[in-house]
Each structure stands twice: as C-alpha cells, then as structure tokens.
C-alpha cells in the first residue's frame, strides 16, 4: 500500500544507508509510469545504490529487509546487482520507470497539444506532517478540478527523502468538459489550469509546507 511505502521510505531515509535513488510511486503513478506493466502492483518503491569502492549486495539486501519490515514485497527478479563492471544494473520496474521518466516531457507536450490540462508541482514537508499534507493537497486539487469542470487524475510520487522530511511531486492530467456544448478554447484551458495551480499552492501554504524543495531553491 501507499502508507506502507511511505513508512518504508522514511525508514530508509533514517537508516544511514543513503540510497542513490529512492522513489515511491502511488498506484496511479505506477500505472502511468510503467512499473505496473512489469508486474508490480499497487504502490511501487524503486531503490538504487551506487558505489565505486565497495560492494553493494549487502547494502541492497539490508534495504530490502527494511522494506519488508514495513509490509513491502519484492517482485521475483526485482533485485539486480552488477559488481565491478561500472555499468548500471537495470531491469524490471526500475527500468520501466526510467524509460517513462525520459519520455514524460514529450508525452506532456503531446497531451497539451490535444487540449489536455497537465500540471506537475512539488512540495516538501516534515515526516510528521506528510499524511495530513498529502490528504489536504489531493482534496484541494480534486475540489478545484470539480469546480473548473476538469475530469481526470491526480497522482503522487516521492522523489527525495531525508531523515527529517520528504519531497512529494503531484501530477494532474485532466480533460476540460465543454461548457454549453461549446469547444474549450486555449484561454479557457489556461484559466482552468490556473484554478488547479492556485488551489495546490493554497493547500501547500495552509499545511505549512514549502512551494519547492532543495534543487529548485
């Protein structure tokens, strides 16, 4: 579940293992980003380590133990380690996510060209505030979508995790519903997008989170 994944990410962030990649995809994000096609179900956690002077097998095994402690399941063949070659070990859900991540900007532009409202935004908050912040942001976006006449999805992924907090990203993809049977023009789509953007920023402010996280400051 997503809740179990959040607990696992927090444990990893506070374990001192320092994964190079630790991304948690909610079920919708996993479906969109590709890991679901590789056999993963529900929320998906992708964890990776790298090092130039030490073996990684034991570190990765300990990380998987931590995930298991919080209810995570490791799909058959999901663990991949490549020692000594200098080449990355890829496959399964991780490779599916990577491919989707690289395609995403092109797909976004294509969707916008087809009249779909697409937005991605980020925040960061303390671990103790994550559950309430996540719920408030999702509710605010959903309400704004309903008010603006947008039908679509809201997904979330955790991209960065730290001992004291977490940085979730949210993606909105929605189709504007025509008003009075008239086609939805560009200005109308922009206005509806702006309503969603404003609602997300208001929720972030109300929950005392930040409008960005480290690398964008």
Language-model segment annotations:
Residues 6-199, 203, 207-208:
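C-terminal substrate-recognition/cap domain of FAD-linked oxidoreductases
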Residues 211-214:
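Short beta-strand segments at enzyme active-site cores
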């Amino acid at each position: 579940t997503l809740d179990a994944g959040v607990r696992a990410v927090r444990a990893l962030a506070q374990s001192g293992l320092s994964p190079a990649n630790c991304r948690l995809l909610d079920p919708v994000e996993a479906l969109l980003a590709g890991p679901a096609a590789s056999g993963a179900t529900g929320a998906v956690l992708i964890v990776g380590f790298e090092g130039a002077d030490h073996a990684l097998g034991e570190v990765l095994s300990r990380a998987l133990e931590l995930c298991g402690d919080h209810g995570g399941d490791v799909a058959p063949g999901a663990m991949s380690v490549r020692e000594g070659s200098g080449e990355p070990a890829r496959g399964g859900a991780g490779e599916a996510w990577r491919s989707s991540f690289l395609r995403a900007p092109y797909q976004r532009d294509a969707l916008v060209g087809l009249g779909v409202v697409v937005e991605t935004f980020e925040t960061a908050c303390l671990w103790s505030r994550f559950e309430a912040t996540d719920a408030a942001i999702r509710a605010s976006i959903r309400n704004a979508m309903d008010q603006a006449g947008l039908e679509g999805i809201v997904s979330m992924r955790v991209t960065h995790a730290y001992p004291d907090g977490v940085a979730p990203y949210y993606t909105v993809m929605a189709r504007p519903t025509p008003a009075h049977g008239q086609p939805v023009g560009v200005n109308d789509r922009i206005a509806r997008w702006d309503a969603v953007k404003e609602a997300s920023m208001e929720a972030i402010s109300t929950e005392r989170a930040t409008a960005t996280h480290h690398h964008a400051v």
